[in-house]
Amino acid sequence: MSRLLLLVLVAITAFSAPTVPAFDQQPSIQHVTIERATKNTPRSDTASIAQLPDDRLMVVYHKYESGTRSGHDHGVCRIWSKVSEDDGKTWCHPRMLVDVAKGDMNVQAPALLRTKAGALLLISLRAHPKGNSSTMCLFGSTNGGKSFSPRGFLWSRSNGQLLQGGTSSLLELKSGRLLLPYHGGAGNQWKQKNSVWCLYSDDGGKSWQRSNPIDLSKRGAMEGSVAEFDNETLLMSLRTQLGGPFLARSVDAGRTWCKPVVSGLEGGESGTCLRRLPGSGDVILFFNNSKYNKDHHHFGERTPLTCARSADQGKTWRIIGNILADPRAEYTNLDCFFTSQGDAILTYMYARPAWNRDRIQLNAALIARRWFDGS
């Protein structure tokens, strides 16, 4: 074998599908790579999935480019998409959807929503230089995701950084109300004290109203993830620096939120993903069940990636198990989509070694519905 061919094979292997340690291999969970890291595109993450009218799946995510601060939150990234014809096992047809514009630091954190009426909506955040201002953009597609057209802004040139971070989402409630959780403050993204709000729209996204703020100590409340119960009560999980996820509730479809409370689950400062479990009234929470460490720069590691389940609307939780638990890895920026069969596609940012920003892959865990029942 020639030396050149050997080097090519080594390079391909280095960025192939994720290698799952033996202790993480589970028959009910399959791990796939949606976008691998390369020299020119060192980081991809923060994904969102929706089903297209032709039953294919579309994923959107941000992809960083090499250059100054490449791979870091304030590097240059754009919004890309891929599609899957096999329920998330393989992803193809990469396409850039939203480019950076003049005055952007980057365009980040997209989310897709296909409404009950069949509309396909896309949001993405234009972060402006120095991380102290942003614009939240809304797009719509009338041709099954082949193209997206601007539908206006949820906010424009904010005073202080407003964002969704690694937990981007746009929800449609049972009533048809659109709901967008976000957080921010009056300063720089990396130094400001944060509150969480929700924007809500009852006219398909033409106009938006804002909820009351959700506040916590230290860096504040961040990266809200929302689930709706049958009685239309909402539950929100929150990223905090206080020892683990906190929870907040709304009984009026997101217009007002009660004071957040501890979840009883331990972890550092990292995002969560809260979802209703299909075929049950329960909710599940994906989070990093790490030891809280007040001396750690993020108050704990972002491993293991764990799932907990609650049968009483988040009052108590039991750990189902770990999705991944490599002690040298980092798993965060989570999103979960359920297929028509009830199986989960959990997207996550994968970095190994943890906290490196030179090689970050966008991966997905394909989780059989039975896994959540312990079988």
Residue ranges: model-predicted function:
Residues 5-14:
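Bacterial N-terminal signal peptides
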Residues 17-375:
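Asp-box/BNR beta-propeller blade signature and adjacent active/binding-site loops
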